[in-house]
């Protein structure tokens, strides 16, 4: 049985749209970073927990995100250039890391810049200072710490390393 070509095209478009809709939105402009930030990251998933190191480097109008395992082996490298993610280096695509980076951009955006950076229906701010982006929860337990809770139950606990603190 052969499906009609318009049906196949429509189905492909719907699948592509569904894949795009599941990604957290990117800001209209990235948060301003005066210098590189380095975080110790603890990722907890149903499979277990991982220790990671994350470096975020401003490079002109772009931001470079580099995620490493404890041995220094790169796990993900992406650049945010002109509002879109671009591969940085020869690593294979890492959709989980790209989603994490997108939510982290939201977490790092100053509160007063959120209305201009994100569509009103995409985010909320609670009285306790926590935020929600789509189905992700962002909490700020201390000035140098972030907690991100994913819709699937996994979580990321980030601690800013002292050398990179503003």
Predicted regions and their residues:
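Bacterial N-terminal signal peptides that target proteins for export
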Residues: 1-11
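Mature, soluble, non-transmembrane domains
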Residues: 21-24, 40-42, 49, 73, ...
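Post-signal-peptide N-terminal segment of Sec-exported extracytoplasmic proteins
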Residues: 36-73
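Bacterial Sec signal peptide processing site at the extreme N-terminus
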Residues: 14, 19-35
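Well-ordered beta-strand positions
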Residues: 55-57, 79, 139-140
